[in-house]
């Protein structure tokens, strides 16, 4: 259902700006655990009722929808046309929204093989600090477009403005898709994934947890079945990947504190150092660590406190910025949100 709530949203923003009131932006509410906690005295503004698909051209592989549109609805519409969101956005039981996925920059299991959210955002419509609605980007992919605002807002956690609508590039749905499981050691899993990565294979997801390597093969029927016959393994449901991406499986269930390390696939680590590794070992997960894992870590990569629970470890959710990086962030924030209206401190406590 197409619902236009833009006027009400712009009026609320303009009034909050005039009254110097901070705003906490919400959609489906499925990602409020990410980032630093919202300010307790901030006024809530919801984009959930600003929803629906505005424009869809299957033949052009482009869809435009309002920020409150459920990801589940988008997937359903695309599936009827044999198309997908290639960055595998986590579904969170049908409550996750398009705006939340783009604002948090949250990609799923296909990320290292298909691309990130920002790679598929063509354009956005945003509500700025004074209540004005502005559009950035467009509805076509340009090789020489440069680094535009539509990419800048991906992963900005709503700190630059409120996403009202988004244009996305979509891709054809693979003809077939299977998930295979192999009971192997960490060393064997690394070796097998390295071999698959070097080959022209239909690999579209990978995960190592508790002595088990899981991979997803996506593509043409002949290619996928040929790879399966060579690799072997036990076949399971491909629903596994959304359960993984939403942390709806062990060992994530019941966890209070979850940390993510984003690093290089080749970065070495010990057998029992991480509970889960996916994205071809480029994304690694720690569960309920006794202390801040950033302290004393000498390897490459960035740590994120992905799920804080009781926030027993008092620190920034995201990797601390250098003084130069923080200064750049502040300059960008000052241009888009000079009065500090949108989601203050959600990304960093100094923003």
Positions of predicted regions on the chain:
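FAD-binding subdomain of flavoenzyme oxidoreductases
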Residues: 87-88, 94-206
């Amino acid at each position: 259902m197409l619902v236009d709530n833009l006027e009400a949203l712009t009026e609320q923003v303009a009034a909050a700006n005039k009254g110097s009131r901070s705003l906490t932006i919400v959609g489906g509410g499925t990602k409020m655990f990410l980032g630093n906690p919202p300010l307790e005295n901030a006024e809530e503004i919801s984009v959930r009722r600003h929803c629906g698909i505005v424009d869809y051209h299957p033949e052009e592989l482009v869809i435009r929808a309002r920020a409150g549109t459920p990801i589940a609805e988008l997937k359903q519409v695309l599936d009827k046309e044999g198309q997908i969101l290639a960055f595998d956005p986590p579904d969170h039981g049908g409550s996750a929204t398009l705006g939340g996925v783009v604002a948090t920059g949250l990609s799923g299991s296909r990320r290292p093989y298909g691309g990130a959210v920002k790679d598929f955002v063509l354009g956005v419509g945003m509500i700025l600090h004074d209540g004005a609605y502005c559009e950035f980007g467009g509805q076509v992919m340009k090789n020489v477009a440069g680094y535009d605002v539509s990419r800048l807002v991906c992963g900005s956690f709503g700190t630059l403005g409120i996403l009202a609508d988004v244009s996305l590039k979509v891709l054809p749905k693979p003809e077939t898709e299977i998930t295979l499981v192999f009971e192997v050691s960490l060393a064997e899993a690394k070796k097998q994934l390295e071999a698959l990565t070097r080959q022209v294979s239909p690999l579209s997801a990978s995960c190592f947890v508790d002595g088990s390597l899981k991979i997803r093969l996506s593509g043409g029927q002949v290619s996928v079945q040929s790879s399966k016959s060579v690799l072997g393994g036990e076949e399971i449901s491909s629903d596994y990947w959304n359960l993984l991406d939403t942390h709806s499986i062990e060992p994530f269930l019941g966890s209070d504190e979850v940390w993510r390390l984003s690093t290089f696939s080749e970065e070495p680590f010990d057998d029992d150092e991480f509970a889960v590794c996916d994205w071809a070992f480029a994304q690694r997960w720690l569960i309920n660590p006794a202390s801040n894992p950033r302290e004393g870590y000498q390897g490459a990569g960035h740590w994120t406190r992905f799920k804080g629970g009781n926030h027993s470890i008092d620190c920034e959710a995201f990797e601390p910025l250098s003084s130069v990086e923080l200064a750049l962030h502040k300059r960008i924030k000052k241009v888009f949100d000079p009065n500090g209206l949108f989601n203050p401190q959600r990304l960093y406590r100094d923003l």
